[in-house]
Structure formats: structure tokens, C-alpha cells
């Protein structure tokens, strides 16, 4: 009817951007789908080069535009630095700010973990994107090429946040779900139960 509101399914979908850390196999499937669309389909990267064996030893971030998974990014941790890598944005979302918010969320996470340096490999054509966040060429003049692109080593000096997690942090904070340290987790809740396990006083049995 004229003048009636369109059904909800016909309304313009939300373009709000949200970021979350991957927590379960379903989230990792989203990461795989995004990277396959960008790197395998668009850049013709071989499967074994894109999915390099490091995905299960890393933290992954997923960026959403509305309810649609639009982008992802991977973070790995080393002794002195964290490495940001595998930033992928689906082509229809590249005019949004999801990539900027995704990178910033990962940097905030890295600061919370107490790191002082972020390292990455920027495709030469994307050096200016990383410079926007304060990244600078590492300066070692090492030429890096893989998966048919040339890369520049980038480094970003950061200050850990005032709430960075250390050995002095509340032990319950340390065991909360990764990246969600400000909310009580399931183990916080379990701490309200008395110590009743029948094994609580059992001595270890010598082999």
C-alpha cells in the first residue's frame, strides 16, 4: 500500500562496522572464506602458500560491515614483537573503513599484551597504508618476495597500554577468554564454588 513502511527485509542493511577476535571453528571458517576470496581468487595465490600452517598458532580478527564478514587479519607473537599479517578485505568493502578499524583493534590488542614492537611485511604498493598507523620501513634493505609480490619490512614502535597484562595482573584476568579480559569469564564464575573435587588432596602417583 502507498505510504506503508517497507518490510524489514527490504530496508537498507546496517553498515555499522564491528570487530571481534575469532574464538571457535566457525570463526576460523569465516577467516578462511575471506582469505580464499581475496588471495586465492583475486591474487591467484597458491593454496599451500596462503594457508601456511600458522593459522592454528595465531590470533585472528574478523571485521564485519553490518552482519556481513568483510575482512580479517592475523597476529602472531614472538619474543620481542608481534607480527601483523594476512590482512584481507573483500572487494565490495574496500571503500569502507573496516580495514583501518581492524588494524587498530589488533594494535590495541597487542598493546594490551604488553608488546612494544609490531612487525609486518607490506606489499610495496601498500607501504603508505601502514605508514598511516606509524609504521616505518625496518631499514635492513632485505629484499623479500613471495607469492608473486615484493614486500617491505615494516616496524611500529608502541607503548604498552596502562592496563597491559603482566605477572602482577589479577590471575582471573589472565585466564579469561583471549582479548576479552575486562569481563568475568566462566572460570571467574566457577571460583564461587567451593573446592570439592575428590582429587584436591590426592598425591601424585610415582611411575
Report each predicted region and the residues it spans.
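Conserved hydrophobic beta-strand within the GNAT/NAT acetyltransferase core sheet
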Residues: 84, 118-122
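A generic structural signal for beta-strand entry/edge sites
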Residues: 79-81, 117, 149-151
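Terminal substrate-recognition subdomain of acyl/acetyltransferases
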Residues: 2-17, 111-112, 124-207
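Conserved acetyl-CoA-binding loop-helix of GNAT-fold acetyltransferases
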Residues: 89, 95-108
Amino acid at each position: 500500500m502507498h505510504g506503508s513502511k517497507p518490510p524489514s527485509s527490504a530496508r537498507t542493511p546496517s553498515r555499522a562496522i564491528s570487530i571481534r577476535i575469532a574464538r571457535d571453528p566457525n570463526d576460523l571458517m569465516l577467516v578462511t572464506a575471506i582469505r580464499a576470496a581475496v588471495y586465492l581468487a583475486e591474487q591467484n595465490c597458491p593454496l599451500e602458500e596462503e594457508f601456511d600452517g600458522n593459522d592454528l598458532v595465531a590470533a585472528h580478527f574478523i571485521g564485519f560491515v553490518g552482519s556481513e564478514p568483510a575482512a580479517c587479519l592475523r597476529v602472531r607473537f614472538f619474543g620481542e614483537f608481534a607480527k601483523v599479517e594476512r590482512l584481507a578485505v573483500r572487494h565490495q568493502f574496500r571503500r569502507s573503513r573496516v580495514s583501518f578499524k581492524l588494524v587498530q583493534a589488533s594494535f590495541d590488542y597487542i598493546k594490551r599484551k604488553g608488546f612494544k614492537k609490531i612487525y609486518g611485511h607490506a606489499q610495496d604498493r601498500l607501504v603508505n597504508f601502514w605508514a598511516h598507523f606509524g609504521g616505518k620501513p625496518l631499514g635492513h634493505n632485505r629484499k623479500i618476495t613471495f607469492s608473486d609480490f615484493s614486500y617491505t619490512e615494516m616496524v611500529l614502535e608502541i607503548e604498552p597500554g596502562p592496563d597491559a597484562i603482566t605477572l602482577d595482573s589479577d590471575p582471573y584476568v589472565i585466564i579469561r577468554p583471549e582479548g576479552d579480559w575486562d569481563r568475568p569469564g566462566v572460570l571467574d564464575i566457577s571460583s564461587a564454588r567451593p573446592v570439592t573435587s575428590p582429587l584436591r588432596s590426592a598425591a601424585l602417583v610415582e611411575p
